[in-house]
Amino acid sequence: MTDPPAVPEPSAGLSREQAERLRDSFDPEERERIERTVADLLDLLGKTDAMAVLSEFAFAEGSLRFSDLEADLDAAPNTLSTRLRELTEAGLLDREAFDEIPPRVEYTPTPKAEALFPVFAHLHHWAIDHDL
């Protein structure tokens, strides 16, 4: 088997043909793993407010607290809490609790989440020219 083509950065964008060639370059086992990961990611990001939460981190500088997200998003507190837990469990956010009174918890995007941030930039760029 030949080596798969170099994977361009997500911000570079791929034509349909390039994406197909890249996908087809993997052995069936690896291709199945990749497609399963994409499906799992889409399931997670398709949940209420998950995209909005990650988008906040994509354009934020540094950590965010629950209260920051609650102030910026029109999300129910219980939904926001659930999404933060799920995003943390998925390895997209780190949660740090500080031993203070009142208690303070901060969330920070992981490198795994930061690798998705160009996608949010593309979505915002797309929205400049398109409405739904």
Residue ranges and their predicted role:
Residues 34-76, 106:
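N-terminal helix-turn-helix DNA-binding core of bacterial DNA-binding proteins
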Residues 41, 50-56, 83, 115, ...:
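Residue-level recognition of specific faces of alpha-helices
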Residues 66-102:
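Canonical helix-turn-helix DNA-binding module
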Residues 90, 119-131:
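Alpha-helical linker/hinge and terminal dimerization helices associated
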Residues 99-122:
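Basic, amphipathic "hinge/linker" alpha-helix immediately C-terminal to the N-terminal HTH DNA-binding motif
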